[in-house]
């Protein structure tokens, strides 16, 4: 029987190598164990926010995996589209000019009172029919003379879609403004004037100019505050403004001085002239046309202005019944000698709220466009 030969290392390998490998492995295990212990200790000893952060991150990872798993389990055709935000409706009409009015909760204890009234066309020898509207004649001209002149065609022709300005809108009393309350009240001491062009006559003129331009009638709008800082001399100021425009743009045929009225009772109650057009309340409007009296009021072209006033009155009342008060034909100057299409128009009064006036300005401009282009 042969004796077993002792086990030998492969040639060239030392007996110390296996022991070194074992030692290295043992050391690595010790280091790993120590690191794990330090991490655990740090977690247990960490401040609460740090621990919460770690837990939160872990929870996020779990939820993320759960969400991915859930998404994978839903067929593609059954996937739910992300929720879409509902876009606010785009306002394209006169509503885009409206402002937020003060609620009744803002009403002071000593607020002033406003009443509403719809004015009719009037009757009697002073009132001359003008289509569905009327002309209140306070001059010495006979009713027959006024009626005959009102029946004449416009003394000028508007060039539709022309780049040359045809109409100028301006404001002698630009700081006149309106009630800003939704209810029928006004703040005591409110003088119904403001230099803020977003709420005074400039706001109404802007609506009118935009409406005419949209109808193809090139219109300029001047927002000079001719009555500020001094009310005195406002007509001289506005006259100079209009003359500058006429010199620069001789194509202008119509000049509109846009104001608001101020109807107030003896007890301080303000009256708002109103009407309802297409289910919405509007301020009533009134055209004022001057007449030459031969002395203090020199208006040699008053007949041409009267024709224009009558055409506009007829158009507005035909299109929007109840919108107008009778045209006031009186011995007033108002710089109406500058063109044969110069008129003053009162859009509501200081008792109306601003939105009623803005709406009325829009309607008046629509009626004007029809009158000028017919």
Give the positions of each predicted feature.
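N-terminal Lys/Arg-rich, disordered targeting/topogenic segments
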Residues: 1-16
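N-terminal catalytic or cofactor-binding beta/alpha core of small enzyme domains
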Residues: 20-253, 262-267, 362, 370-373
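Structural recognition of the beta-strand scaffold that forms the well-ordered cores
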Residues: 168-171, 219-221, 254-257, 286-289, ...
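Solvent-exposed loop/turn segments at secondary-structure junctions
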Residues: 174-177, 225-229, 260-265, 292-295, ...
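A short, glycine/acidic-enriched catalytic loop
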Residues: 187-191, 263-298
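Alpha-helical scaffolding within the catalytic cores
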Residues: 239-242, 267-275, 327-333
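Active-site-adjacent substrate-binding region
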Residues: 301-328
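Active-site-adjacent mobile loop/cap segments within catalytic or ligand-binding domains
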Residues: 322-374
